[in-house]
A protein has these predicted regions:
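A short beta-strand-loop structural module common to alpha/beta enzyme folds
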Residues: 1-4
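FMN-binding flavodoxin-like domain, especially the glycine-rich phosphate-binding loop
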Residues: 9-163
Length: 163
């Protein structure tokens, strides 16, 4: 439970889950909360038992909190045994099927075809910024306070010299 993957080498991060009681899998959301970074490009894949409504709002919330970009969501019906459906053997038996899987592949191919170059360009900018930040560390909170104090002291020196 405390092992988290390094997602930094990936241009697009795909988070896939079934929908459980209207939400993405809690463990997947925990991993996303721990691993996503500012500027990550995320695509959500989901299977749902009920209607095709936006069930990925919890993944969207995690992405917003981490300043990652949720590009799009793809969903298809999945086998569901929630509540009364359990009594009749479930609904959407045999789903996702090959047609649903082909739809997901076509969805991804369209995404790469339409936005692949843009995503690669943005990733190159991000890699350049990461390299700069690694070469020039900010120094943390105390360093920022010292730098601010020095700037304020210089302003007071200038006003004293002017008088």
């Amino acid at each position: 439970k405390n092992e988290y993957p390094d997602l930094s080498p990936y241009h697009i991060i795909i988070m896939a889950s079934g929908i459980y009681y209207g939400n993405f899998d809690k463990d997947l959301l925990r991993v996303a909360d721990h691993c996503l970074r500012d500027g990550d490009k995320v695509v959500g894949l989901m299977t749902y038992g009920g209607q095709a409504k936006f069930n990925g709002r919890d993944l969207d919330g995690v992405c917003r909190m981490k300043f990652a970009n949720l590009l799009c969501m793809y969903g298809c019906p999945g086998f569901d045994t929630y509540g009364p459906f359990k009594l009749v053997g479930g609904m959407n038996k045999g789903r996702p099927n090959q047609e649903d899987i082909d739809g997901a592949v076509a969805f991804y191919d369209r995404l790469v075809e339409d936005y692949g170059e843009i995503i690669i360009e943005e990733r190159a900018k991000r890699d350049k910024q990461d390299a700069f930040n690694a070469a020039h560390p900010a120094g943390g909170l105390m360093s920022n306070i010292k730098r601010s104090a020095k700037k304020i002291a210089k302003k007071f020196e200038k006003t004293d010299d002017a008088q």
